[in-house]
């Protein structure tokens, strides 16, 4: 898949802010970031309150996704451009959601909010008022999502890519350092997993590294491109970014995102775990 099919530049974005059929949407870890200023015409997608089920741990179901996108004024034929802060990590999470429900024309703004701001481009607090649509989603695409049983079976057989920080992988932390350390019952990583922090795929300005650089990053870490791959992190957002890199940029079609990730796996009873911190004690 060429980059033009899944990425747009900030130049392209600025030239297409008012193009019919193009919808910009901001998705941030900090769901209030949009309110302080966003790309003109962009809508807000709240990953926590709008893309997640409020009762069970799962994403919104098909009907919920249809209702959300209809209310946001997104049509089935629209080109959706997703962007956000911190190298697009939650924008990539939303991209994965859109692909799960079959929206074919969705792309990331290369560099996200960081690149847009570094360029000195306009931000506004004005919120758009888009007419509602009647969006229709497809059934979830099971080929891009991994569940716990498949993950356990993958140990020693498939590529397991832990995209968390080295300290999380080593069992020193349960979550990123700036977050509460209470997401899983146990620390460590899935046996046979390689550690390739998701942020290694990004340049300083938030844009993605070149294909050659990305291949080197994963090749040096020991990724076997002949095997199926499952990426995981803590809740599935950082691993969505790695899933995007491996599948959409590098063209590995046999890649799944395990959105249960360490929050689920680290709390399962009886599954194997490697924890260098405990083993070295």
UniProtKB/Swiss-Prot annotation:
Keywords attached to this entry = Repeat, Transferase
GO terms, molecular function: thiosulfate-cyanide sulfurtransferase activity
InterPro entries xrefs: Rhodanese-like_dom, Rhodanese-like_dom_sf, Thiosulfate_sulfurtransferase, Thiosulphate_STrfase_CS
Q: Where is the Rhodanese domain?
A: 18-125, 154-274
Q: Which Gene3D superfamilies match?
A: Rhodanese-like domain
Function of this protein? May be a sulfotransferase involved in the formation of thiosulfate.
Question: Know anything about its domains from the record?
Answer: The structure consists of 2 domains of very similar conformation, suggesting a common evolutionary origin. However, the sequences of the 2 domains are very different.
Protein name listed in UniProt: Putative thiosulfate sulfurtransferase
Record the organism: Saccharopolyspora erythraea (Streptomyces erythraeus)
């Amino acid at each position: 898949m060429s980059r033009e099919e899944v990425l747009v530049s900030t130049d392209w974005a600025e030239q297409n802010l008012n193009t019919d059929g193009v919808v910009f949407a901001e998705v941030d870890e900090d769901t209030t970031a949009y309110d302080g200023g966003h790309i003109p015409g962009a809508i807000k997608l709240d990953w926590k309150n709008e893309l997640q089920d409020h009762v069970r741990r799962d994403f919104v179901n098909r009907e919920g996704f249809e209702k959300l996108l209809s209310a946001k004024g997104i049509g089935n034929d629209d080109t959706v451009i997703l962007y956000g802060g911190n190298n697009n990590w939650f924008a990539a999470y939303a991209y994965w959601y859109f692909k799960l429900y079959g929206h074919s024309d969705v792309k990331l703004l290369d560099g996200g909010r960081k690149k847009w701001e570094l360029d000195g481009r306009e931000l506004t607090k004005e919120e758009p008022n888009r007419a509602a649509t009647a969006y229709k989603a497809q059934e979830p695409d099971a080929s891009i999502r991994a569940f716990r049983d498949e993950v356990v079976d993958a140990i020693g057989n498939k590529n397991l890519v832990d995209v968390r920080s080295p300290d999380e992988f080593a069992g020193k932390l349960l979550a990123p350092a700036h977050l509460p350390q209470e997401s899983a019952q146990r620390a460590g990583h899935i046996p046979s997993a390689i550690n390739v922090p998701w942020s290694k795929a990004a340049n300083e300005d938030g844009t993605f590294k070149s294909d050659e650089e990305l291949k080197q990053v994963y090749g040096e870490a020991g990724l076997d491109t002949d095997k199926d791959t499952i990426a995981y992190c803590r809740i599935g957002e950082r691993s969505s970014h790695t899933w995007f890199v491996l599948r959409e940029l590098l063209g590995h079609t046999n890649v799944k995102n395990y959105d249960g990730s360490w929050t689920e796996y680290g709390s399962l009873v009886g599954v194997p775990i490697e924890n260098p911190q405990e083993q070295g004690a």
